[in-house]
């Protein structure tokens, strides 16, 4: 009996050690190193990620649900469908083959039937993969539910190229002519975010970043510089 208890205790200790090693081995989120972001509005701000206007990418400052954001209007005075373009700073990432995640904070309005993400890829898609998206089998489109609330969607990218081939940008959002969309904040990350991503909480599950167990900074702190 005592021997069984002893072995059980040893197994529990081994499991605890393995869990601890896994936790410390996980890559910590670091702004400008493995994730970048932009907060959209009348005066957008961000780190190494910018929204860019195009001939088929026209936006307007807007307020939805009390939140300053950008609207991708439809219909609009431009060619084809309207899109919202984003450019990753080349100093962060340029070319190659990358697994990445794009986190989109959008207003869940029934004015748009869908929201798609098209990105510069190494896979199949228009213009040699420069606009790969849901229509090319990359993932499913977002189907807004009309809750009139701000929600978050995470796009998983498995074959990213991000070489500015999407009309000088790296990815874009669009309803493909099926209504206006509103976007507040966007994050681009080379580490996996949590499925229940909370834009106002630390990136991922709170983790110790040093022996004193200081937690990772929140998005609000990152943007204001406050501790």
What positions do the PLM features span?
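Solvent-exposed strand-to-loop "edge" motifs in beta-rich extracellular domains
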Residues: 91, 103-111, 120-122, 160
